[in-house]
């Protein structure tokens, strides 16, 4: 999965939950960071995880086979 794939997926989930980028910003995330995450730009893992927490996305890791 690429960064672009991740960005499309998290945006899709946000939209399905009826949340806007403004809603994410209101929860304390920099608006530019929200745009960067959803545009597939490189962001810190800390910011990505914060975005996922706000949206309600569970991030899990699986060992590659």
For every predicted segment, state its role.
Residues 10, 20-21, 45-48:
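Helix-turn-helix DNA-binding elements, focusing on the entry/boundary residues of the two helices
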């Amino acid at each position: 999965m690429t960064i672009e794939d991740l960005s499309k997926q998290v945006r899709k989930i946000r939209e399905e939950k009826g949340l806007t980028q403004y809603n994410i910003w209101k929860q304390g995330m920099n608006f530019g960071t929200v745009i960067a995450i959803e545009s597939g730009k490189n962001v810190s893992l800390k910011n990505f995880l914060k975005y996922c927490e706000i949206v309600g996305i569970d991030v899990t890791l699986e060992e590659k086979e």
